Design a protein with these regions (language model features):
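A structural signal for short, well-ordered beta-strand segments and their strand-loop junctions
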Residues: 36, 60, 108-111, 117, ...
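Non-heme Fe(II)/2-oxoglutarate
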Residues: 3, 16-101
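Catalytic core of Fe(II)/2-oxoglutarate
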Residues: 135-143, 153-270
């Protein structure tokens, strides 16, 4: 299936729900703007996408105090439908419509898939509260939106692996967004957009397709560059101290080496 055909279907769903999505984002944007929409694609297509997910052993594993998950952006190694659906979300009609919903004038997709692509998480894997890196890989444009398309059939909220956003900071109560099959969640990314993935408690694969949108303008006034920054969960006092020190160290490195010491592997090398 071609990306243009997939994009047509996504666009139709967004147009149908546009008013409710605008309301959701507008009422939340003063903290962490977000919306989500279900039944993004016909069920048979969404199921086909899930079945195309690769064996996690063929993906890169990220395992540290920050996170534990499988990722890849090298989409030409896998079933073509995965690449097609990722880039369907980069169709300029969809980008423009989501920009209208979120009231962002200039918005660009990222064909490098910097920190995007696909991810897979299994039992006991997690993603701690964090802020996404403020810029694209070349530090030219501002990262402003995170798009997460969940694709695991019959995934119950009790299984964990759900998106959590922390509009009042990580010491206060989070909002949980169920990573429900065939659901798209969109959240704003700025220096207060703390979000996480709850630990998975069920013996199955939670699969996600990720995109980021960028802009010429920062998401907030007086925004500055920052690296991806992790924190501990409220009960993880020691981990939180370690991760805050790690954030400071990596920011210090970027002040000396603006693009970092090591080139990221998490991009699509075509």
């Amino acid at each position: 299936m071609k990306r243009s055909d997939i994009a047509d279907l996504i666009l139709e769903r967004l147009q149908i729900e546009k008013s409710s999505l605008e309301h959701c984002f507008k009422t939340s944007k003063d903290s962490i703007g977000y919306f989500f929409i279900d039944d993004v694609l016909p069920e048979d297509i969404a199921t086909k996408i899930f079945r195309a997910f690769p064996d996690p052993n063929s993906m890169e594993i990220k395992k540290s105090l920050r996170e534990h998950k499988y990722i890849t952006a090298q989409m030409n190694k896998y079933d073509s439908i995965l690449e097609e659906v990722i880039f369907a979300f980069q169709d300029l009609r969809i980008v423009q419509l989501i920009g209208n919903i979120c009231e962002i004038n200039t918005l660009y997709p990222d064909n490098n898939l910097y920190a995007g692509g696909i991810s897979l998480m299994r039992k006991e894997q997690f993603l701690n509260p964090h802020l996404d890196n403020s810029h694209d890989k070349d530090r030219r444009n501002w990262r402003v939106l995170n798009l997460l398309y969940y694709i695991s059939p019959n995934w119950e909220i009790e299984f964990g692996g759900n998106l959590e956003i922390w509009p009042e900071g990580i010491k206060n109560k989070q909002i949980t967004i169920h990573s429900k099959f065939n659901r798209l969640a969109v959240i704003s990314t700025n220096d207060a957009s703390w979000h996480s993935v709850s630990p998975i408690t069920y013996d199955a694969s939670r699969c996600c397709i990720s995109n980021y949108y960028f802009s010429d303008s920062p998401p907030k006034k007086n925004s500055i560059f920052y690296v991806t920054s992790f924190r501990g969960r409220p009960e993880q006092k020691i981990r939180d101290t370690i991760l805050q020190a790690d954030n400071l160290l990596r920011m210090g490195v970027r002040k000396v080496f603006p693009k970092g010491l090591i080139k990221t592997n998490h991009i699509y090398r075509k």
